[in-house]
From Swiss-Prot:
This is UDP-3-O-acyl-N-acetylglucosamine deacetylase. GO terms for molecular function: metal ion binding; UDP-3-O-acyl-N-acetylglucosamine deacetylase activity. Zn(2+) binds at residues 79, 238, 242. One of its GO terms (biological process) is lipid A biosynthetic process. The gene is lpxC. Gene3D superfamilies: lpxc deacetylase, domain 1, lpxc deacetylase, domain 2.
Amino acid sequence: MIKQRTLKRIVQATGVGLHTGKKVTLTLRPASANTGVIYRRTDLNPPVDFPADAKSVRDTMLCTCLVNEHDVRISTVEHLNAALAGLGIDNIVIEVDAPEIPIMDGSAAPFVYLLLDAGIEELNCAKKFVRIKETVRVEDGDKWAEFKPFNGFSLDFTIDFNHPAIDASTQRYAMNFSADAFMRQISRARTFGFMRDIEYLQSRGLCLGGSFDCAIVVDDYRVLNEDGLRFEDEFVRHKMLDAIGDLFMCGHNIIGAFTAFKSGHALNNKLLQAVLAKQEAWEYVTFEDEAELPLAFKAPSTVLA
């Protein structure tokens, strides 16, 4: 049986909040089978839980938030959520003593290292996947995203920002997902932002944690970071990282082929909600026999060592 995964032990890290610029302590806790992914704000009394749920997602200019029925939110969840998807973590409680997850270096890599440091434990309960049975597509002007049936998890993403620095890079990235591929090819790709946007936001007391340490920063012509890019096509790789995190907001790894053109957090979420709302378009599946599991979700040696 392919089993659900959680952490072996509690781990903790500190970082800076993108919005406040203040220190945030992040604690990742193991959770029992069928708990799901739960984000928790411990700065509130009593603490408030935000279960990962496609319907709770709000996209802001700066980040992705989860919002509850009382309009309380937890911000900047997308990169940690991508790391959870990448390593196939089904059950976890994520605590922060702030309104936001720390931005770290703007990628998912610090979260991957933290999860691997905690160790991954299999629980004696079948892991549920969402399998796509029918094509579902959403559009917004010239932007679109779709899922098609596929026995694995593939992603094909194209960006078009009409910006000299971004146009000079390769703007399409496609891959067959696996934990190894995610860690090597996607997890280190950083978020990017425009200097003028960051300066404007900071002048209004927002994005106070925004810096060259946690993003690729571009002006109207070029990348401003002294160290340059981690990958020639880091921009599109990061958009794929975002999509992996967005699509894991249903709390389950997805078996299907994802293709997107100029999509972002909001459209990715719209696609996920469109899939889940169409009962005949998907089904839950479990695997008794590892031989039947799509290669995409085979546990890498580095994870279950």
